[in-house]
Amino acid sequence: MSKHSLIENLKEQIEPIAEGLDYELYHIEFVKEGKENYLRIYIDSENGVSLEGCEKVSRAVSELLDDIDPIQESYYLEVSSPGIDRVLYTDKHLEKYKGYNIVLNLYSAIDKKKKYEGELVDFNENEIDIKVEENIVTIPREKISKTTLKGEL
């Protein structure tokens, strides 16, 4: 099973568990760091994410993973909030944070810049519009390596 198929399969099975515990499944990733593998599950809610909430989701997901055993190699399971400087992965995430400040990291420079920061104004399947100072800047999505919410307390 490919990594993409694994993640999609896990999303389908973990999403109802998270929702049953009053959390949104924000993102899942399976990564190798050094010699260790990590299955990271990010959850969110309108009221924030507590350590207790992460523990509840972790226990429920751990039971599921023990039952279905989708990953052959050893790994660590981590459940956490996406954090204040969260990566915006989906159109749903972008829609939620319209009007907020974001950071766009680019694969290659546009107008000699590889990083743009500004207010998320709009987006479509091809581009993202941000307000930088008083100007609207349109960045093609294929040029964007990472979109992050600019955390502000």
From Swiss-Prot:
The record, for InterPro entries, names:
Ribosome_maturation_RimP, RimP_C, RimP_C_sf, RimP_N, RimP_N_sf
Q: Which CDD domains match?
A: YlxS_C
The family database entries (Pfam families) matched by this protein are listed as: DUF150_C, RimP_N
For this chain, the family text in UniProt reads: Belongs to the RimP family.
- Which superkingdom? Bacteria
Q: Does the keyword Cytoplasm apply?
A: yes
User: Could you name the Gene Ontology cellular component terms for this entry?
Assistant: cytosol
Keyword Cytoplasm in the entry? The reply is yes
- Which PANTHER family has this protein been placed in? RIBOSOME MATURATION FACTOR RIMP (PTHR33867:SF1)
State its role: Required for maturation of 30S ribosomal subunits.
Q: What is this protein called?
A: Ribosome maturation factor RimP
Per the record, the major location class is cytoplasm
Subcellular location, record wording:
Cytoplasm
Q: Name one GO biological process term.
A: ribosomal small subunit assembly
Q: Which of UniProt's keywords are assigned here?
A: Cytoplasm, Ribosome biogenesis
